[in-house]
């Protein structure tokens, strides 16, 4: 199976961007107001949508043909999904439950550990708040055999994308009211997120042609991606539904499929990509630790305070993720198997 190494860059930069966004959103003493802090960094919250497209493409690379041709058992597929998501997420849930130690935390923690908590009506779980993404992605995994059916061929895939966009729009504009739901329908809901997963699957169906085109037209594809991103921010205040994000992130994924540039292909992003999910899940825990250190009493410059808080948060998350994923878990598994 061909390895698309530039996807590592997208995962790494998306994870870092989400940390930047969360630190900016939560820090009490804000940095200087400018286009970067008021528009660019807050937009990084949408990198979770990029993660969805990448996740769908990656899972299709590994399992689309095997599920379509009946070459893998459901037991094997879902065991690997649990093995990938549950250990680190479960650890974060247990830590959060211990810290909160109340009945609500226990109930929410139990729901989290099933990974099926997005089957709840309007889940609004505070234990590992960023864990909503795990629930949405695992719902996609549960539906993946059906997803494979929907993308059985390219023609059906585009039809399904069109239908999913209509359903998403109706869900947001009609069903997202107190008559139908308690909580507004957003990316936590699989109907809202479905077009992003479907786009990832459609890109998979065209992956060979995309790879050949991007490889031959590297600068043209990069220019198109940059222009689309710039246009997205120029018309950022115009409500065009989820279409702009869908287009921009899809084009960046297509660029990454055939790209071999050093920005998306280097040792740093390759390493960060391996722990990108873990960084995403644990970074807010480290932000809360840094917050209690009250760096604002030491650093007078607001911009330097934000940068220092971000660096301390991301470094803490990287170190913790590395130790748990590459040292603690392997040794624990080895002992259990002996």
Located regions from the model:
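Short, amphipathic, aromatic/basic-enriched membrane-interface segments that mark the entry/exit
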Residues: 126-132, 210-217
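Signature aromatic-anchored transmembrane alpha helix within multi-pass, membrane-resident enzymes
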Residues: 162-166, 215-229
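Alpha-helical transmembrane segments and their interfaces in multipass membrane proteins
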Residues: 179-186
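Internal transmembrane alpha-helix with an interfacial aromatic "cap," most often the third helix
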Residues: 142-144, 200-210
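Membrane-interface micro-motifs in multi-pass membrane enzymes
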Residues: 45-48, 129-137, 186-201, 242
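Membrane-cytosol interface segments of multi-pass membrane proteins
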Residues: 1-174, 181, 263, 275-276, ...
């Amino acid at each position: 199976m061909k390895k698309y190494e530039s996807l590592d860059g997208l995962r790494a930069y998306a994870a870092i961007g989400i940390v930047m966004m969360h630190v900016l959103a939560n820090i009490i003493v804000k940095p200087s107001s400018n286009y970067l802090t008021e528009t660019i960094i807050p937009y990084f919250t949408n990198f979770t949508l990029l993660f969805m497209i990448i996740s769908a493409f990656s899972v299709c690379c590994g399992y689309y043909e095997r599920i379509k041709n009946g070459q893998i058992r459901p037991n094997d597929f879902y065991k690997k999904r649990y093995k990938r998501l549950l250990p680190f997420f479960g650890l974060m849930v247990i830590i959060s439950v211990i810290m909160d130690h109340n009945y609500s935390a226990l109930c929410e923690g139990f729901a989290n550990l099933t990974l099926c908590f997005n089957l709840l009506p309007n889940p609004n779980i505070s234990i590992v708040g960023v864990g909503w993404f795990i629930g949405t992605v695992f719902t996609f995994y549960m539906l993946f055999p059906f997803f494979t059916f929907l993308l059985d061929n390219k023609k059906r895939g585009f039809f399904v994308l069109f239908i999913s966009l209509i359903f998403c729009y109706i869900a947001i504009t009609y069903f997202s009211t107190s008559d139908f739901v308690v909580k507004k329908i957003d990316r936590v809901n699989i109907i809202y997120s479905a077009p992003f997963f479907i786009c990832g699957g459609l890109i998979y169906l065209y992956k060979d042609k995309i790879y050949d085109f991007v490889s031959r037209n590297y600068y043209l594809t990069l220019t198109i991606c940059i222009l689309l991103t710039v246009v997205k921010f120029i018309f950022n205040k115009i409500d065009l539904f989820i279409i702009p994000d869908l287009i921009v992130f899809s084009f960046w994924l297509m660029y990454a499929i055939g790209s071999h540039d050093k920005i998306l292909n280097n040792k740093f992003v390759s390493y960060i990509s391996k722990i990108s999910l873990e960084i995403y899940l644990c970074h807010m825990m480290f932000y809360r630790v840094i917050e209690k250190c009250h760096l604002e009493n030491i650093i007078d410059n607001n911009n330097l305070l934000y940068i220092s808080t971000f660096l301390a948060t991301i470094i803490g998350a990287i170190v913790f993720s590395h130790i748990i994923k590459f040292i603690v878990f392997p040794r624990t598994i080895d002992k259990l198997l002996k």
